[in-house]
């Protein structure tokens, strides 16, 4: 008998003896175990969550922090979602502990009370099992040029050519995204892509874009442009793939495009590792070709990311780069979906879907860490303004005998009440900031140690939600009128003043704050429902709190009025973190009409805007159009999916939560006929 035969006989003998003993066990015999799994409340709640998820119509209707960046239900999402309540409890316990350490005379449990009373909301506190993680970032890619992703724990060294750049770039996106709760902006992506194009084909490659570089036996000859587009396809389709490290969501990626003055202001003194400087002509060509390619590619597959922003400088009554301005309007005419950021100075960069980041520096000197791109929000806490206003009213005004009518004499009392809450939130942010530094010092935030981002350059953000409803409760109309304008100015300027007052850049761990109208994709629904359930006033004409200065379901507010309401008389210099003006249209306009709108926006100080026209896709033949249709013009099918933005990124409406799908039906999509856009 061989050793193999002997082992085989021994195996079956042991199994046979075990099964014989097992067979002698009576079915009704009581077997003692250390755990009563069946009656364990923790286990029962988790199983109940799984059952709810299985029965839900889509992922957004079953998850803790729903968003539309998920395309189907699967076990990977369950794995990410099932422990979110536990993550939240851990996060809150850590913040309370740090509050006690930093502020021994402050009642740290007030943090829990403010959260559970829905006065404030801590964004993405459930996203990480480690409970503490930064929110979003705009990175510098310079460390990527020097060391690849080794500093992130990867194996890839610095890229040497265009092919390796594209591959390692995708790896970098997934590696960094896995360590942030929100978006990762790579504003230098096309700048560095252009750098490697020059290495591949020479400095004048863009002038020879139709030059044939390969003649395959089977297939069309490949030109420089075709090869470039192939690399873009690799990058874009890769970053749109779901990632296990993000709960089966794709990475939330933002790209920026620059006009010439913005490029010169941001990168005028920038040098690549080999001592060369970027030039405007080649980058401009790459930017335009990429935008045209990406817009056309969305007729093949509706791609969600990157979220794109074009920056335009407007000064002395005109756009300084007229060529880029004209190109932007042409792209809008052709159905391209992107944001436009208008500024009169190169002191800020809009890198997320609504956030205006004032840059701490524009110096590009990697050795001392002064990288102007590095910014973002490391923590976001949002105020439920509608509830806060009503709590103030109940305390200060409800006992008045005469009928209450809000006027400017009440602002002192209101701002005093709101300031007390703001002051507490600074403490909460301070505690969270120190917890982030604890993670940083323990080596758990490698993106920072590797130099992609500096924790001291990121903001602690105070968000606002429920602005419209707060104003309506006080008897105001949310249209362009002096009373509502003053209300916005008073509220926003209070936050800005307090942000400056509490700013600390002298300590080792900097505290810098900003305020913004947060997107509130799921929070807007939550706050509305919380307030309604708790007996606070909520309007009947909507089912959520929107993130705009105007009400997106108000048919009486025109496109130009919406622009003014996101301009200098409402936001201006008062709201230091910004807000995005979403203009919903029923069809795309002409380039001339878009020029009129952008010019009007620039003159009225509306810094950040975009246009939303629903896209449509036939379920049967796959035909895609950049405007809605009920019947497919190609095959005649009526099985149609619509795509639009909730706030920042383009997704299938069927993937939205039920509440957001309902809200979509109430949006006013403006119909504009004439070249001259009237009120």
Where are these regions (language model features)?
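N-terminal amphipathic/hydrophobic targeting modules at extreme N-termini
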Residues: 2-3, 8
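Short hydrophobic transmembrane-like helices used for membrane targeting/insertion
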Residues: 3, 14-15
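Conserved catalytic cores of very large enzyme subunits
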Residues: 22, 27-456, 477, 481-642
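Contiguous, well-ordered alpha-helical segments that form the cores/surfaces of helical PPI scaffolds
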Residues: 191, 460-473, 493, 645
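Metallocofactor- and cofactor-centric catalytic cores in central/energy metabolism, strongly enriched
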Residues: 226, 473, 668
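Long insertion/accessory domains within large nucleic-acid-processing enzymes
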Residues: 627-679
């Amino acid at each position: 008998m061989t050793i193999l035969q002997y082992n085989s006989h021994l195996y079956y003998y042991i199994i046979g003896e075990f099964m014989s003993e097992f067979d002698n066990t009576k079915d009704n015999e009581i077997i003692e175990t250390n755990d009563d799994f069946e009656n364990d409340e923790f286990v029962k709640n988790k199983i109940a969550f799984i059952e709810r998820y299985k029965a839900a119509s889509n992922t957004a209707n079953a998850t803790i922090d729903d968003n539309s960046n998920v395309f189907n239900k699967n076990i990977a999402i369950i794995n990410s979602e099932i422990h979110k309540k536990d993550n939240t409890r851990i996060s809150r316990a850590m913040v309370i502990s740090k509050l006690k350490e930093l502020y021994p005379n402050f009642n740290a449990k007030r943090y829990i009370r403010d959260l559970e009373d829905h006065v404030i909301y801590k964004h993405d506190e459930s996203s990480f099992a480690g409970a503490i993680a930064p929110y979003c970032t705009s990175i510098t890619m310079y460390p990527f040029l020097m060391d690849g992703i080794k500093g992130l724990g990867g194996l890839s060294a610095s890229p040497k050519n265009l092919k390796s750049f594209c591959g390692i770039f995708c790896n970098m996106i997934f590696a960094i995204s896995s360590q942030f709760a929100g978006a990762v902006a790579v504003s230098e992506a096309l700048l560095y892509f252009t750098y490697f194009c020059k290495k591949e084909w020479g400095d004048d490659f863009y002038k020879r874009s139709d030059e044939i570089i390969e003649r395959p036996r089977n297939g069309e000859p490949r030109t420089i442009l075709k090869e470039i587009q192939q690399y873009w396809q690799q990058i874009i389709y890769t970053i749109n793939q779901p990632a296990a490290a993000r709960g089966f969501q794709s990475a939330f990626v933002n790209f920026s495009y620059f006009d010439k003055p913005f490029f010169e202001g941001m990168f005028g003194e920038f040098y690549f590792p080999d001592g060369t400087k970027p030039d405007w002509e080649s980058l401009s060509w790459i930017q335009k070709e990429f935008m045209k390619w990406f817009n056309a590619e969305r007729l093949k597959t509706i791609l969600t990311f990157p979220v794109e922003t074009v920056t335009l400088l407007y000064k002395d009554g005109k756009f300084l780069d007229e060529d880029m301005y004209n190109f932007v309007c042409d792209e809008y005419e052709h159905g391209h979906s992107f944001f436009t950021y208008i500024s009169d100075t190169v002191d800020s960069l809009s890198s997320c879907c609504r956030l205006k980041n004032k840059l701490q520096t524009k110096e590009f000197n990697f050795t001392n860490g002064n990288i102007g791109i590095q910014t973002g929000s490391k923590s976001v806490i949002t105020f439920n303004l509608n509830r806060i206003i009503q709590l103030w009213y109940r305390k200060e005004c409800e006992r008045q005998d005469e009928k209450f009518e809000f006027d400017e004499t009440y602002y002192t009392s209101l701002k005093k009440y709101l300031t007390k809450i703001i002051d507490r939130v600074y403490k909460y942010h301070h505690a969270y900031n120190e917890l982030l530094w604890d993670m940083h010092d323990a080596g758990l935030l490698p993106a920072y140690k590797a130099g992609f981002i500096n924790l001291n350059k990121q903001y602690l953000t105070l968000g606002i939600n429920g602005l419209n409803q707060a104003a309506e409760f006080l008897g105001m109309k949310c249209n362009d009128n002096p009373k509502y304008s003053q209300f916005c100015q008073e509220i926003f300027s209070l936050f800005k003043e307090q942000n400056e007052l509490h700013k600390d850049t002298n300590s080792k761990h900097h505290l810098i704050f900003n305020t913004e109208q947060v997107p509130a994709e799921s929070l807007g629904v939550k706050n509305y429902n919380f307030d309604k359930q708790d007996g606070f006033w909520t309007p009947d004409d909507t089912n959520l709190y929107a993130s705009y200065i105007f009400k997106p379901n108000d048919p009486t507010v025109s496109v130009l009025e919406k622009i003014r309401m996101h301009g200098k008389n409402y936001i201006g210099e008062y709201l230091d973190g910004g807000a995005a003006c979403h203009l919903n249209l029923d069809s795309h306009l002409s380039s001339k009409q878009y020029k009129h709108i952008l010019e009007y926006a620039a003159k009225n100080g509306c810094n950040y805007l975009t246009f939303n026209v629903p896209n449509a896709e036939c379920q049967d033949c796959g035909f895609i159009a950049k405007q809605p249709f009920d019947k497919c013009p190609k095959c005649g099918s009526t099985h149609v999916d619509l795509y639009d933005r909730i706030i920042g990124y383009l997704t299938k409406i069927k993937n939205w939560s039920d509440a957001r799908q309902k809200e979509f039906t109430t949006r006013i999509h403006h119909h504009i006929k004439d070249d001259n856009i009237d009120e």
